[in-house]
Amino acid sequence: MFGISFSELLLVGLVALLVLGPERLPGAARTAGLWIGRLKRSFNTIKQEVEREIGADEIRRQLHNEHILSMEREAQKLLAPLTGQNPPQETPPPAAESPAPSVPTPPPTSTPAVPPADAAAPPAVAASTPPSPPSETPRNP
């Protein structure tokens, strides 16, 4: 944790034994342990609070950016008729629902619809048949 080896720890223990004596050393070790535990807990609490704030700030920043983007899109839609440009197509955000699959529409037919009255007679025969000439009958002079 701090890079303290066992020999350094042993040296600190011997100095504490010489300075405090055998009577006060257990109480001092207990007090030092409590202080170290409190410091660890407070550092962990501060660390969690900072991480929570960073996460909240990031979410707040993301929402702010999305709000700005939506306002820009609305402004472009409103200004598009004035500038003569087509408004940009809206693309859904990545987290949004996927668009419904498009159903292809059949191409329009190029032949005009036939009215029901003409449908009974074939149009090619009716239009191309010339009137029949009168049959020849003998003439009386």
Curated annotation (Swiss-Prot):
Q: InterPro entries given for it?
A: TatA/B/E, TatB
Q: Where is this region: Disordered?
A: 74-141
Q: Which GO terms describe its biological process?
A: protein transport by the Tat complex
Does Transmembrane count among this protein's keywords? yes
Has the keyword Zinc been applied to this entry?
no
Give the CC-aspect GO terms.
TAT protein transport complex
| Example GO molecular function | protein transmembrane transporter activity
Tell where it localizes. Answer: Cell inner membrane
Membrane topology label: Single-pass membrane protein
Organism's domain of life?
Answer: Bacteria
Q: List the disulfide bonds.
A: none
Which spans does this entry mark as compositional bias, Low complexity? 116-129
Function recorded in the entry: Part of the twin-arginine translocation (Tat) system that transports large folded proteins containing a characteristic twin-arginine motif in their signal peptide across membranes. Together with TatC, TatB is part of a receptor directly interacting with Tat signal peptides. TatB may form an oligomeric binding site that transiently accommodates folded Tat precursor proteins before their translocation.
Q: Which PANTHER family match?
A: SEC-INDEPENDENT PROTEIN TRANSLOCASE PROTEIN TATA, CHLOROPLASTIC
Q: What is this protein called?
A: Sec-independent protein translocase protein TatB
According to its UniProt entry, this protein's organism is: Pseudomonas aeruginosa (strain ATCC 15692 / DSM 22644 / CIP 104116 / JCM 14847 / LMG 12228 / 1C / PRS 101 / PAO1)
| Gene name of the encoded protein | tatB
